[in-house]
């Protein structure tokens, strides 16, 4: 088991690699927002529309020992290649930025927003950008 090095800032959850799996632990701090987003159906809608990285609820097979205090678990597909914004060419930066903005607008239209706007929340599946941080999606409040 190895926590992803880039997954340490958000008290709502962490991403870890375990037995060739990508898992996201949701901790108590993230339960209210995650529950609201999940119960609204917006996660499945955004996944279905290709905006958001797919996620499944994994079978409970002893995962709690990997991240004590985790309340919920998500499992994501393993990406063939992980890249970072400082490695991207201009066209990839542009595609990622436009995806991020369009995704945020789509969320706002459904009563949700993003808690942060970091380029590190975008990865590429082939040449297509996809948002990867499910716990950054929160209910919009005036």
Go through each PLM region and give its residues.
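Catalytic activation segment of kinase domains across protein kinase-like and atypical kinase folds
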Residues: 113-142
């Amino acid at each position: 088991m190895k926590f992803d090095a880039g997954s340490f800032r958000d008290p709502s959850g962490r991403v870890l690699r375990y037995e060739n799996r990508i898992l996201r632990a949701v901790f108590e701090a993230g339960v209210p927002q995650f529950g609201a987003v999940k119960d609204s159906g917006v996660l499945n809608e955004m996944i279905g529309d290709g905006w958001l990285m797919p996620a499944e609820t994994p079978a409970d097979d002893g995962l709690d020992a990997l991240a004590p205090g985790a309340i919920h678990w998500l499992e994501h597909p393993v990406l063939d290649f992980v890249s970072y914004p400082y490695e991207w060419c201009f066209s990839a930066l542009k595609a990622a930025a436009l995806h991020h903005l369009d995704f945020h607008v789509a969320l706002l239209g459904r009563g949700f927003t993003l808690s942060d706007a970091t380029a590190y929340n975008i990865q590429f599946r082939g040449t297509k950008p996809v948002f990867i941080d499910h716990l950054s999606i929160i209910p919009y409040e005036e």
